[in-house]
Design a protein with these regions (language model features):
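Bacterial N-terminal signal peptides
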Residues: 8-18
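Aromatic- and Gly/Pro-enriched helix-to-coil junctions and flexible linker segments
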Residues: 22-127
Length: 127
């Protein structure tokens, strides 16, 4: 690669490689605007103080703090670890089928599942 054509080609390759990594950035998932509305729609009917899901497990999704407290059996969200987070396992159908969530309702939309999974992988921030 000598001469002006070789130099231009090398420069074009370097520029293309630099922009290849910039084209697709992972979106930042926000608890308040992305996750909480899904939990309110699909989970809050059962998982709030005094309701069946809460009575059975101790899990309330009424607030960030209550969600992060988890159940009387342990946490359901492990920040940064969606594979081990019980919440993600349940909504993806990877747990015991008898406790599929939402219980007795249709599954979450794939986009909603991906949003919750991404939020957990981003550290499950209260944002």
């Amino acid at each position: 690669m000598h001469g002006p054509i070789g130099t231009k080609l090398a420069l074009a390759i370097v520029i293309a490689m630099a922009f290849a990594g910039c084209g697709r950035q992972e979106r930042q998932v926000k608890f308040a605007s992305d996750v909480k509305p899904v939990l309110d729609r699909a989970c809050l009917d059962c998982h709030e103080d005094g309701k069946a899901g809460y009575e059975a497990s101790g899990l309330s999704v009424a607030s960030y703090d209550e969600l992060m407290t988890g159940t009387r059996f342990g946490p359901v969200v492990l920040p940064g670890d969606p594979e081990s987070s019980v919440l993600v396992q349940l909504i993806e159908g990877r747990a015991d089928p008898s406790i599929k969530m939402p219980h007795g309702s249709e599954s979450l939309y794939q986009g909603e599942i991906e949003t919750i999974r991404l939020w957990v992988s981003q550290g499950a921030p209260n944002n």
